[in-house]
Amino acid sequence: MVVKQQKDASKPAHFFHQVIVIALVLFVSKIIESFMPIPMPASVIGLVLLFVLLCTGAVKLGEVEKVGTTLTNNIGLLFVPAGISVVNSLGVISQAPFLIIGLIIVSTILLLICTGYVTQIIMKVTSRSKGDKVTKKIKIEEAQAHD
């Protein structure tokens, strides 16, 4: 009987339960968005919130995995409204096409540069912390050898 309960605990949650978990995260992120002093989309807040919940173990991967996979597989359908908005805004785009293309190119280059710098900083911090651990271990071994 105990073995059966353990197997049930490791079984992924039902699809409807997973939808409820994701909906609750989005609901909470919508509430957080209303209290934030800076404008930030609730979907971004929800992603960060879900990431934190998964990392802390408050939400298990099995509780959101199937719905997450389904949404990821059908992500093209989720971009249809954005595509329709672009088509509806063609009048605005046609007024300054070179300016918009230039802005896209400049913002992409800036994004790549910022990403590169952040990656370098993270790599330096990570290598320093690993180096500090090795240095401490060597110093401890030397101290023990002198005793």
UniProtKB/Swiss-Prot annotation:
GO cellular component: plasma membrane
Membrane-spanning parts: 13-32, 42-64, 71-93, 97-119
Keywords (A to Z) from UniProt: Cell membrane, Cytolysis, Membrane, Transmembrane, Transmembrane helix
Signal peptide (residue range): none
Keyword Cell membrane carried by entry: yes
This protein's record includes keyword Ribosomal protein: no
Membrane topology recorded in Swiss-Prot or TrEMBL: Multi-pass membrane protein
One GO biological process term: cytolysis
Induction, as annotated: Regulated by the two-component system LytR/LytS.
Location within or outside the cell: Cell membrane
Similarity remark: Belongs to the CidA/LrgA family. LrgA subfamily.
Function: Inhibits the expression or activity of extracellular murein hydrolases by interacting, possibly with LrgB, with the holin-like proteins CidA and/or CidB. The LrgAB and CidAB proteins may affect the proton motive force of the membrane. Increases tolerance to penicillin possibly by inhibiting the formation of the CidAB holin-like complexes within the membrane, thus reducing penicillin-induced lethality. Possibly plays a role in programmed cell death (PCD), triggering PCD in response to penicillin, and possibly other antibiotics, and environmental stresses.
Protein name, entry field: Antiholin-like protein LrgA
Lineage per the UniProt record: Bacteria, Bacillati, Bacillota, Bacilli, Bacillales
